[in-house]
Amino acid sequence: MSPPRAVSAALVVDANILVAAVLGSSTGPHLDLISGRRSLITSEAAFEEAYKVVGHVRPSDLFVLESLLDLVTIIAREDVADEDLAAAETALRIAPASRNGSVTDAHLLALAWTLDADLWSHDRDFAGTGWPSWSTANLLAAV
């Protein structure tokens, strides 16, 4: 048996990680710690989703979300190939873990493929796609 795969040098960060970092969970300090060990990247759509959620729940903390831009790089939608996005939608639609057929995070999976980066998310949607994804707890144990 081979040893477990190491965490990739870059991580694609889901909106729920950004929201958790802003709204006071321990994810904030973890984001800072992990950014010192890995490149953190997200999509425009994920950052916009986080902005919308934080703006609705706690608009006074939007500046905290904006400060995360010092740690996380945003990649534009046009930097991901349309065929990768379509393939990611298909992979998520048939993934057994979530069984809900949701393709809303296909942009993150396609970005991860484009960059050959693992995913960091609290969602189970990526399980079953064949692409590495990490919860915060598992990621901290691995880096």
PLM ranges: what are they?
Residues A20-V22, V53, T129-G130, A142:
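Residues that scaffold the ATP/ADP-binding catalytic core of kinase and kinase-like folds
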Residues G28-L31, R58-P59, W131, T136-N138:
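Glycine-rich, phosphate-binding/catalytic loops in enzymes
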Residues D14, D105, D123:
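Acidic active-site catalytic centers that drive phospho-/nucleotidyl reactions
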Residues R5, T42-S43, L109, D116-V143:
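Acidic, PIN/NYN-like endoribonuclease modules and their adjacent C-terminal/linker elements
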Residues M1-T42:
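Short, well-structured N-terminal submotif of metal-dependent ribonuclease cores
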Residues I34-L40, E44-I94:
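PIN-domain endoribonuclease scaffold, especially VapC-family toxins
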Residues I17-L18, A46, V64, L108, ...:
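Alpha-helix capping/helix-boundary segments
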Residues A76-D118:
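Active-site neighborhoods of divalent-metal-dependent phosphate/nucleic-acid chemistry enzymes
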